[in-house]
């Protein structure tokens, strides 16, 4: 049926291909991922991630072929992230509105600030990635670093007080609670 997805594709110029009893070819897009997962992790994995644009057809086809082939559940938990916006528009290599990590690092932005910005929105929400956002992430990290220094100073001055212990234990508990709620790192921060 023409609507079926391809498990094996005919060879194309300048693409790798393999000889098989059915003729030369290459794995279809969906089977590539299933085969790599099977080889490295086995027939069932705990977490599989990807963009929301991959739910259909890619992830549904991965499920169909893997569960049909092995008779076992393919993935226990899916994490589908929303699209990343750059300066208010969907990031697209073809539109030229994207940054590479190398570009950002060469402009002096720290990996830590970039990571913080990317974690500042829940994975199910779109994030508008801007250079101003990285600067704001720098400021947020500076506040966190200053708080840690102050907490260490208080601990050194007063010893391991019950009040300080309760404060930091409460902060940790709220962070863990947020992360336990659909991996909501942004709420934890």
Regions found by a protein language model. Name each.
Residues 1-154:
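Alpha-helical recognition segments enriched in aromatics with Gly/Pro capping
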Residues 127, 133-189:
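Helix-loop elements that line ligand-binding/catalytic pockets
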């Amino acid at each position: 049926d023409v609507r079926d997805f391809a498990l094996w594709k005919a060879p194309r110029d300048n693409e790798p291909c393999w000889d098989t009893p059915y003729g030369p070819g290459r794995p279809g897009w969906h089977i590539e991922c299933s085969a790599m997962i099977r080889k490295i992790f086995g027939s069932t994995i705990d977490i599989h991630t990807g963009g929301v644009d991959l739910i259909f057809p890619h992830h549904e086809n991965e499920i169909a072929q893997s569960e049909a082939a092995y008779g076992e559940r393919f993935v226990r938990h899916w994490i589908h992230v929303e699209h990343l916006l750059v300066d208010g528009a969907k990031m697209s290599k073809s539109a030229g509105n994207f940054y590479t990590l190398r570009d950002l690092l060469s402009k002096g932005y720290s990996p830590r600030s970039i990571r913080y910005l990317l974690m500042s929105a829940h994975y199910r929400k779109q994030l508008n990635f801007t250079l101003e956002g990285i600067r704001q992430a720098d400021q947020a990290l500076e506040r966190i670093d200053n708080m840690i220094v102050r907490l260490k100073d208080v601990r050194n001055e007063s010893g391991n007080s019950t009040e300080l212990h309760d404060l930091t234990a409460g902060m940790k508990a709220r962070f863990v609670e947020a992360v336990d709620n659909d991996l909501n790192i942004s709420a934890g921060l």
